[in-house]
Amino acid sequence: MDPNTVSSFQVDCFLWHVRKQVPDQELGDAPFLDRLRRDQKSLRGRGSTLGLNIETATRVGKQIVERILKEESDEALKMTMASAPASRYLTDMTIEEMSRDWFMLMPKQKVAGPLCIRMDQAIMDKNIILKANFSVIFDRLETLILLRAFTEEGAIVGEISPLPSLPGHTNEDVKNAIGVLIGGLEWNDNTVRVSKTLQRFAWRSSNENGRPPLTPKQKRKMARTIRSKV
C-alpha cells in the first residue's frame, strides 16, 4: 500500500475530528455541516477500502499535523494562506431538501466514474428541475456535494452523489453524470431543466431556458409530430 495514501487518510481523519468540534460548540453554518457529513461518509468508505481503523488513523494524523505545525513558521503559513485560491459554496437546495429520504417505485442505479446516479424510472410526463449544492473555484465546479432532481410538486425523482469509496471528481465527471441522469429521465417523456447555478458552473451545454439541447431521439420525435400535424 502506498504510504502517501495512508498518511493522507490519517491526516484527513484528524482534520475531520478538529472540524467536528466546530458544530459541537454551535459555531458551524449549514454549508459547513453539509461538508462535514459528506466527508464523514467519504472517510468511512476510504477506511473500509484501505482496511484502516479511523480512530487509530486519527491519532496518527494528529502526530503528523503536530510535527508539521512545529516545523512551520508563521511567515510561511501567512504566505501559504495568501497564495491559496478561495472556493465558494453554492446552494440550490435547503438542508431539508438535501437530507430528505426518498423512495423509488422502479429504481435504476448507475455508477459513472466516482459518482453514483440514481433515478426512478416510474416517473413519466413530468416537468423536472435539477438542483445541486457544490463548491466553485476559478469559476468552475470544484466539488459536488449532492445533486437531486425534483418534480414541480417537490418530489425527489433522481440523484447524483459522490461515491464515498472513490473520493475526488472533476467538472467533466459531474457534467457526464448530469447527461446520464437527464437522458434517463427524458426517456420517459419528462421535461428536464437545470438550475441557473448549475447551468452556469457545471452544465454549459444548455440553452437560454436552462434545458439541454435536444437529443437525436427527441429531434426525430419532434419531426414526426410536426409531420403528423401537417
Curated annotation (Swiss-Prot):
GO terms for molecular function: protein serine/threonine kinase inhibitor activity; RNA binding. Coiled coil: none annotated. This is Non-structural protein 1. Residues 180-215 are annotated as: CPSF4-binding. Residues 217-230 have a biased composition (Basic residues). Homodimer. Interacts with host TRIM25 (via coiled coil); this interaction specifically inhibits TRIM25 multimerization and TRIM25-mediated RIGI CARD ubiquitination. Interacts with human EIF2AK2/PKR, CPSF4, IVNS1ABP and PABPN1. The keyword Ubl conjugation applies. InterPro entries: NS1, NS1A, NS1A_effect_dom-like_sf, uS15_NS1_RNA-bd_sf. Residues 1-73 are annotated as: RNA-binding and homodimerization. A motif (Nuclear export signal) lies at residues 137-146. Residues 223-230 are annotated as: PABPN1-binding. It comes from Influenza A virus (strain A/Leningrad/134/1957 H2N2). The dsRNA-binding region is required for suppression of RNA silencing. The keyword RNA-binding applies. One of its GO terms (cellular component) is host cell nucleus. Inhibits post-transcriptional processing of cellular pre-mRNA, by binding and inhibiting two cellular proteins that are required for the 3'-end processing of cellular pre-mRNAs: the 30 kDa cleavage and polyadenylation specificity factor/CPSF4 and the poly(A)-binding protein 2/PABPN1. In turn, unprocessed 3' end pre-mRNAs accumulate in the host nucleus and are no longer exported to the cytoplasm. Cellular protein synthesis is thereby shut off very early after virus infection. Keywords: Eukaryotic host gene expression shutoff by virus, Host cytoplasm, Host gene expression shutoff by virus, Host mRNA suppression by virus, Host nucleus, Host-virus interaction, Inhibition of host innate immune response by virus, Inhibition of host interferon signaling pathway by virus, Inhibition of host PKR by virus, Inhibition of host pre-mRNA processing by virus, Inhibition of host RIG-I by virus, Inhibition of host RLR pathway by virus, Interferon antiviral system evasion, RNA-binding, Ubl conjugation, Viral immunoevasion. Residues 205-230 are annotated as: Disordered.
